[in-house]
Amino acid sequence: VAGTKEKKGPLGCCFDVVSQDDLFGGESWEDAESRIQSLAFEKLLEKTGMMPDDIRYIYAGDLLGQLIATSFGLKTYDVPLFGLYGACSTMGESLSLAAMCVNAGFADNVAAIASSHFASAEKQFRFPLLYGNQRPMSSTWTVTGAGAYLVSNSPVITKCDGDVCRIVDNGYANVIISGITTGKIVDYGVKDSMNMGACMAPAAADLIEANYKDFEVTKGYYDMIITGDLGYTGKEILLTLLKEKGIDISDIYTDCGIEVFDKNEQDTQSGGSGCGCSAIVLDTLVLDKLRKRELKRVLFVPTGALL
């Protein structure tokens, strides 16, 4: 699910739901983000052929205080909910925990959801929308969007209506979460909320180095490494930090914040950000290529600045 600005970006053709009004029919920006989460979960149920009762747990989060977008957006479905806050890394956190839950045998089907909204994030973290502040080139544009994913122990789903059963192929039989490296808090003392790429890049570098060591990764193993929202500024810092560690990923690396907008045409400075940034790019760019076998192994590194 994406907003109007995201629709005009390079991935605009690939979203399932786009509203012509970034309020999504709501009465406030917070209400709009709740509706985005609800729409994303509804679309997940539609595409998988499931009912809410088929989902054992939901792991979900957003950027707002007390996770109000998540709690109000998902309350009507009556599904056990774990509310998560990992700033803009929430999509990775929810997928990681969902995969652990399924792999450990605690659930068969778990939903992982994350959302953000430009206007609600600006209102809470930065400046009033009518203030008209100047944005430095290192700043990023919070994505209005949400992604909902099913983590399941079965590549196909059996749906029964009375005595009649049918097989629903979710189309992602070849896409699995084969391993997880959990990031640590890495703080270089950056305090500029208009330069989150610089704040997050050291943590991303630390995680990628840890992943290479944990899984004994050699050059050529991954077809793509994609971070969440370092943007153009954070990208260069990340590549520099990794080269200092003896790791060169420049030929396979990109960032969700870079992919979601055209910075020259859309005036988005360093790129996109927010929980919704990695949430919508993961499906429209990464999973689509995995499903088509254009990519075989991807390291997905959503990043968050706990400023």
Residue ranges, per PLM feature:
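Condensing-enzyme catalytic core mediating Claisen C-C bond formation in acyl metabolism
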Residues: 1-30, 128-209, 214, 251-267, ...
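Short coil/turn connectors at secondary-structure junctions
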Residues: 52-56, 77-79, 104-110, 137, ...
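Membrane-interface helix-loop-helix junctions at boundaries between adjacent transmembrane segments
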Residues: 107, 121, 130-131
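Phosphate/pyrophosphate-binding loops at sites that engage ATP/ADP/AMP, CoA/4′-phosphopantetheine
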Residues: 40-55, 207-221, 289-290
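Short, well-ordered, mixed-charge alpha-helical segments that flank or form enzyme active sites
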Residues: 67-68, 118-123, 159, 185-189, ...
